[in-house]
């Protein structure tokens, strides 16, 4: 075979390369992370936790505040991190660029050589009472990040109860009390091409309406369409919840935004529908499902973080204590395939 026939033409090479790159980023976006909460007694040391992430091939972590021990343990681990700015810091960081610069210097820049920061999440499920501080705090953190020469996206995490009129999902919109401060945030995220983080819990939808929501719809085990929406069909509650937020974004000028599911999971005891078996079913089905997107965003993997690594016995009410994939002794509560 001649050389001219044995080698692909430059246009073909470019096409093949673009397909490989697209496949890589789609796979990367679909990798599963796990949230590392610390509100529990007798939890393992941060170094042991990071070792457990690596042992289980968990490549992404969410950390709810700048814990020095955890950040130090993450050095050199190659685990990508969502680092939260606690909501209690919003007013201080919104009122002072100097304070925001200091926060980024101490908690991000100091670890830049060894920790892979993926997102800085400013505020978790911010309530309307402090929502007026959110945009300015995000802008000040963004200024500090860019001023330090860091390439880290800045976002915020919302709960799905910020939306209403969610059935069918295409009717979803933001509640008025959230819309007033979220719409400027949505505009900011769009201008920076940053995703919106969403804590998405089919369990809570099921828990609040067991008379009308069947367990199989929440666990990804329904055998047929449950919710028909013009142009879309829903066989699981996760997709319906997610797409209702996408619909709300479209109504608020954020149709270009991607959503990162920054929390989701299923408790093993403490309330209706909780069991080890249900949690195992939900989590393992979730991991497979998010590879393929949702009806409103088909074919694009959904970056997703499972809540949580461990049970946290300092939380209330009772069902909030039992979301962990692992016991404090690092033994798995049930089998999960992270691959």
Swiss-Prot record:
Of which family is this protein a member?
A: Belongs to the glycosyl hydrolase 17 family.
Under Pfam families, the record lists: Glyco_hydro_17 (PF00332)
The record ties this protein, via InterPro entries, to: Glyco_hydro_17, Glyco_hydro_17_plant, Glycoside_hydrolase_SF
The record's EC number reads: 3.2.1.39
State the top-level EC class: hydrolase
Name of this chain's protein: Glucan endo-1,3-beta-glucosidase, acidic isoform
Factors inducing expression: By 2,6-dichloroisonicotinic acid (INA) and salicylic acid (possibly an endogenous signal for acquired resistance). Strongly induced by infection with the bacterial pathogen P.syringae pv. tomato DC3000. Induced by infection with avirulent and virulent strains of P.syringae pv. maculicola. Induced by infection with the turnip vein clearing virus (TVCV) and cucumber mosaic virus (CMV).
Q: Does the record bear Transmembrane helix in its keywords?
A: no
**Origin superkingdom:** Eukaryota
Q: What is its main location?
A: endoplasmic reticulum
The record's subcellular location field reads:
Endoplasmic reticulum; Secreted, Extracellular space, Apoplast; Secreted, Cell wall
Stretch forming the signal peptide = 1-30
Span-the-membrane segments of this chain are none
Q: Name one GO biological process term.
A: response to cold
What's in the keyword line of the UniProt record?
Apoplast, Cell wall, Endoplasmic reticulum, Glycosidase, Hydrolase, Pathogenesis-related protein, Plant defense, Secreted, Signal
Question: Which PROSITE patterns does the annotation name?
Answer: GLYCOSYL_HYDROL_F17
Q: Which organism is it from?
A: Arabidopsis thaliana
Q: What's one GO MF term for it?
A: glucan exo-1,3-beta-glucosidase activity
Give the active-site positions: 125, 263
